[in-house]
Each structure stands twice: as C-alpha cells, then as structure tokens.
Amino acid sequence: MAVKTVVLGLDGADHDFIGAMIAEGELPNFRRLRSAGAAHEIENDPGQGNVQFWTGAAIGAGPGWHGHYFYLQFDPKTYDIVMDYDIGLPEVTPFWETLDKEGYRAAVVDWYEMPVKPLKNGVVIHRWFAHEPLTHTEFHPPEMAEVAARYAASDPIAEGFASQPREGAEALTEFFDRLLSRIDIKASFYADQIRETDWDLYVACFSEAHNAGHYYIQLEDETHALHDPQLADELRHPLRRCYRELDKGIGKVLDAAGPDANIFMVGGPSMGKFISANSALGEIARRVDLGWNAPRSGAETAKETYHSLIPQGLRRRLAPLARLVRRKVASSDYKHRRFFAVPHNDNAGAIRINMKGREKYGVVSRGAEYDAVVKEIAEGVSSFKNPETGRSIVGRVVDVAREFDGPHRDLLPDVFIEWDRTGTHGDFTHLASEKFGEVSLPRQTRTGDHGPTGYFWAPHSNLASPERPACVTDHILRAVRSAGPTSQQRL
C-alpha cells in the first residue's frame, strides 16, 4: 500500500524549542523534515488561540468566516455561555472534506476542535487522544473504534491534568509518563494504518506538546517564576523528553509513508509562560462599565464566593455548578450592561458589547456609540498596570469590527485584549489602576500558555511564505491534487 501525502499536526508544538533542540544535535526526524523543503513561521490571527489557528489552517479562512473562537461561546439570544457544539456554529468545509468530495481517500485523526462529519471515502477520528477530554471520541466509520481499541482501551490521561492536585515529583512523573505513552500508541496506529491502506491523504495529529507545555514548562524555563531546578532534574526535563518521544513517533510515520510521500507539518500555537489577566477581566470590565464603586449584583457575589471556596483542582468535577453560576450571572446581569467579559484563550481577554439589534437586550448602537465604547474599554483595561514591570497589562487591543471580515463576525467577541507578557517571570497576581483600583488574581493550575506563532513545513523549497494559518489549506490541497489520480481512479 502507499500514501501520497501525509500531514503531521503537532498541537501546541513550539517552533523555537524544536529549533533549539535541533541545534543541539537532537530530534533527527524533525531535522530531516525541516531540511527537506520550506520551513515557515506562521503568525496567528490577532487575539486568537488554538481554535482559530487550527480551524483557519483547516478551512483556509479567518475567524469571521466561521465564528468559532473558543470551546465556550456566548449566545446573544440567552446571554448564556455554552459549549461550542451546543450553539449551532456555521458549517465549515475543511480541506479533507473538499478532497473527499473530489474522490480522494483521506484519513484525519484528532485535528484540533473541528466539527466532525463522516467522509464518503475515508476515515475521521475526533478526540481519541485529544488535549483535554471534553467530549467522547467519535469514530467514522464506527468500526474504527474496534481498530483503535487494539492499541489502547482508553486514553491514558482521560481524566485530565487539572482533575486533581498534582504536586511533587511522584505525582507529576506519574501523569507525565502516561502522557508520553500516548505518543507511541498513536504513532504505531498511524504507521499501521498507512501501511495497510492506499491513502491519498493521511492527517496524523499529536497533542502531547500541548499538555506538556501547559503543565511542565516551568521545569524547562529557568526564567520562570515557578522554576524548580531540583524538580526539573527529578523529572529529567519533561519538555525535552516529550519532544524526543514525538521525534520517535514522527520517525515511525515517516518510515511507514516511504520516501516518495509528500510530508507536511503544521504545529502550534507556540508555548511560553502563563501570564494572563483573564481571571480578573470580568471584574475589570465591570468597573470600567459601571465605575469602581458600583455594587456587585447577587449573581456576581455568588460567582466570587464559588471561586473563593472551591479549590482550582476540584472545579473540573464541579463544572455543572460552575456553568450554573455563569448562567446566573449572564442572565441576571449582562442584559443590563453595556459590555462584559466572555471566556477565551488565556493569551487574550475577550469582551462582548451589548449591541442593539444583535443581543436580545442590546443597549449600544452601532456606529459612533460603538466606537466610543471600544475606546472606553481599551483605555480602561489599559489603565491597569503590572507592578512587576510598571507597564500596562495590555499589549494590544483588537477591535474585531476593524480587524476581521466575514459573514459570521458577529458571533465573535467585539474586543480581544492581548496581554503584555514581556519582562514578566510568572503569572499576574496583582493589578492596579489609578482610576479603577486594585484587583487580585488567583493562582492558576497551568504554568504555560500559547504564544502568537506556529509553523508550517512543506516538502517544496519554493513555497511562498504563509502569513496566517488560513494560508496552509491551499498548499495541502495543491499537493494532494498534483500527486496523481485519486485512489478510486487508480482502482
């Protein structure tokens, strides 16, 4: 059997970290791929995280063309915060569905957070060994579940890192070893599938760099405020071990694909220190909207009490209660507000404006009033400073109406606020504004978070540099179509 094109997807992989290990003589398979063609860095869309990075790379479009920005989305009809799969997002067509309609045989395993549709000629597996176990695995066709079970009866980290406190070498090592075991399981599955079936396209994704970056980066980054050199030695530098295992897994896939296959790699978004004001943005937005001394509502007081009483490690188990609190705040309070914070990736905060004609109880008109509110938000949030640096916590304010186009732009928050992470060694703990007072932030479970860049490696040295994730799609489509007749035509 033969495969014409392979796309390796490395969720959360950091291009600079890979490059540094290659320069030290490690990661031979990464080096082999990078030197075989073109290697480009990709800048993510402004204020965006994993969802847009991977969705954009799959469908060839920016966030305004699909409206999907986070796994939790705001519903303007109810003011509720709901799971992305419950809100009825617009249908999108990733590159593998386009190829499937043209008669190509494709397999796609664990592409990050894409709506799942069965393929006529191929295989789709969604959330088999994903970054976080938010939903059950979907297998199309269903019999692929039995095939996958031969390699692992269940996800070795199915409960997720944050399901319980994990401190000390023993607890961190136990979870990390299970995380690494997933790489070999998936690599073996991919290699066997590639050898056993005639594929036009095989998309093989790994998410382990994502998990390792969120929870173990402080053991690799000596400038991190939480760096513990003794613990790093006890765990034998886990990030390096993760990338070495990924390199071995990639080697298995490359050997199975053979020398004639086109090999692409998409990775990112990058990883760095966790530095975010998202946990305080709800309170910051309230003060900017209503004033420093405005009394909290009963719903907001309940939310604050929940966060003060429930330890971070228990919140995943109590997620239904958290959603109830969130709904109470949204339905009771947000309809009376001009703007409010909504959940988003930690690299940037997100604020929704209560717009007339869009939100059920909208109060802000489009045009001059909207522009004035955006300016007020930008100035208000920017007035909060990080005491460690003396600078504003805001690196960039993204006005969605001006930055993004597309028919589904109204599904997005109206303002994204990228946090200024320069010169800071650890997460924000205390913020201060001369106008709006002081805000304290709780300690987060994660120690690492995503940066603004990813990368795209292609087997063609004359490849034009892709500027955004959306530019990846055309290159892959062109490679598959130019590789010859479809598997169906060859039959």
Question: Where are the regions a protein language model picked out?
Answer:
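Alpha-helical packing segments of well-folded alpha/beta enzyme cores
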Residues: 95, 182, 186-193, 235, ...
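Secreted, luminal/periplasmic, and some membrane-associated catalytic domains
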Residues: 10, 19, 24-25, 32-43, ...
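Glycine- and acidic
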Residues: 15, 171-176, 228-239, 361-364, ...
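Active-site regions of oxyanion-processing enzymes, predominantly non-cytosolic
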Residues: 3-5, 105-107, 182-218, 417
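Glycine-rich loop at the start of a catalytic domain that most often binds anionic cofactors/ligands
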Residues: 22, 52-62, 279
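Low-complexity, glycine/alanine/valine/leucine- and proline-rich hydrophobic stretches
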Residues: 418-466, 472-473
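A Trp-anchored, charged/polar loop motif used as the substrate-binding/catalytic surface
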Residues: 180-192, 392-402
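Active-site His/acidic residue clusters
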Residues: 196-241, 245, 277, 347-348, ...
